[in-house]
């Protein structure tokens, strides 16, 4: 009887401590936030958008980055094009990513890094123009507009 009582007390104590687990608190307000940047490149007009979802604990739970462009009066997004965007061979030729990676695959690396780090403090540029990321492997795309769009979304989340 004594062993059963001690086991019960230990079990209640364990559940009590588990319920007191500290909840990670982020620095952002709960909600979905949007940022965008417009620019022109190679004769096409682009709008880069970033959507950032922050949960009730203030933590970044998801990031979605895409780039819409209009060329020859046709609008589409880079994520919609998937492999048809045709960046894999270019990134392979740069030599940083074995076998290369499409645009959407590279931007997913950036999205995941933002969720992991919960901020953009990790961003380091490898060029004076601040277009090439030096702080994340698997990315050869010019990333300045993507980071700027996320910055705008996170600014709204503060």
Model-derived features with residue positions:
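Active-site- and interface-proximal helix/loop "cap" or "latch" segments in soluble metabolic
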Residues: 23-158
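C-terminal motif of bacterial Sec signal peptides marking the signal peptidase cleavage site
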Residues: 16-19
